[in-house]
């Protein structure tokens, strides 16, 4: 499984910490960050890379997480969640089959960011009754 990472200038330091953590956990990391671009361009780069292959997940970090969430949810086939706790990160995989999360470096500290990333990438999709909602989301965009 490849994890696609991106950040703007405000989220880059936290993204680098997440990157190191996930590499230590033996995940394949693809960093699409362009530090000279804003959150919109970096979010689009993460989402595009996630959508290029099955089994990819994305994490985008900026100052607050809200902007990248808004961008990601505009894209066809992208189910994304803005998260600031590890349980939500885990559950958005299980119940929503989210392929991307966004978080804010001014909201989430280093240890919490690692736990969020771990919860997201280890969370299995439960399918079943949740697939109805996922299908509804996919029809919207």
UniProtKB/Swiss-Prot annotation:
Known EC number: 5.3.1.26
Pathways involved: Carbohydrate metabolism; D-galactose 6-phosphate degradation; D-tagatose 6-phosphate from D-galactose 6-phosphate: step 1/1
Catalytic activity: aldehydo-D-galactose 6-phosphate = keto-D-tagatose 6-phosphate
UniProt record, GO biological process: D-allose catabolic process; galactose catabolic process; lactose catabolic process via tagatose-6-phosphate; pentose-phosphate shunt, non-oxidative branch
Keywords for the protein's UniProt record, in alphabetical order: Isomerase, Lactose metabolism
InterPro entries referenced in this protein's UniProt entry, alphabetically: LacA (IPR004783), RpiB_LacA_LacB (IPR003500), RpiB_LacA_LacB_sf (IPR036569)
Enzyme class: isomerase
NCBIfam families assigned to the protein according to its UniProt record, in alphabetical order: lacA, PRK08621.1, PRK12613.1, rpiB_lacA_lacB
Entry's family note: Belongs to the LacAB/RpiB family.
Protein name: Galactose-6-phosphate isomerase subunit LacA 1
Organism: Streptococcus pyogenes serotype M18 (strain MGAS8232)
Lineage: Bacteria, Bacillati, Bacillota, Bacilli, Lactobacillales
């Amino acid at each position: 499984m490849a994890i696609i990472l991106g950040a703007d200038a405000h989220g880059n330091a936290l993204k680098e910490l997440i990157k190191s953590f996930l590499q230590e956990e033996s995940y394949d990391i693809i960093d699409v960050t362009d530090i000279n671009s804003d959150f919109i361009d970096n979010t689009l780069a993460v989402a595009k890379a996630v959508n290029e292959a099955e089994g990819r997940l994305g994490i985008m970090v900026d100052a607050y997480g809200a902007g990248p969430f808004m961008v990601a949810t505009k894209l066809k086939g992208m189910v994304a969640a803005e998260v600031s706790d590890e349980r939500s990160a885990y559950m958005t995989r299980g119940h929503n089959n989210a392929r991307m999360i966004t978080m804010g470096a001014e909201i989430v500290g280093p240890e919490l960011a690692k736990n969020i990333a771990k919860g997201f990438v280890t969370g299995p999709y439960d399918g079943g009754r949740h697939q109805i909602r996922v299908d509804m989301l996919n029809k919207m965009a």
